[in-house]
Structure formats: C-alpha cells, structure tokens
Amino acid sequence: MENAYFRKTMNDLGRITGLEFGGMLVLENSQQLKKELVEAADSLDDQVKITITNIEEIDLSIIQLIIAFINRMDEINVKYEFVWDLDAEQKLFLENIGFSNEFLMIN
C-alpha cells in the first residue's frame, strides 16, 4: 500500500490479537487493505484490538471496508475494540457520514 501500512500482532498460537493500520487510507490503497483484512479474518483470535492511527487521509472506500470487516467479525463471533487516532476534521467526517458511533465502539 502506497503511503499506508498494515500490521498484525499475534499470540503464541499464531492467532491475530491486534491489527494496526494508518497513513493514506484512500481508494488507491483500498484493494490492498481489503486483501489484508480478508486474509486476517481467517486467523483472528476471540478478541481483537484494531488501532487506526497516523491517518493522513481517509475516504468512504476505507469506511466501507471497515464496516464489512466489522460485519465479518460479528458473523464469526469475534469481540473487537477500535482505537482511533483522529484529528478534529476526521472526527467531523465520520460524524457527517453517520458512522461515528459505530466506529468508536467496543463489541
């Protein structure tokens, strides 16, 4: 992903307990992020912490991917916590598209 990153944290059993991504979270990087999330979905532990930080930009394509990932985690009964590092403009963006409460949740 150009100007974006994706990291996984695993436990001793090789199950993913944490995901972190950030940078340019825009359409140009959405296919690679989708690939990473699809691969990660098969190896998630029972609880996962998802940290989204160092966001340079974020657009609706990434929001849609995150919502799809949330739906997948719900389907496979994975508990999750989101940690967001948002500036005021990014918080306003999420509020304006109607997703702020969903993203700041712990399930």
What spans do the regions from the language model cover?
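STAS-like cytosolic regulatory interaction modules
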Residues: M1-S61, I67-N107
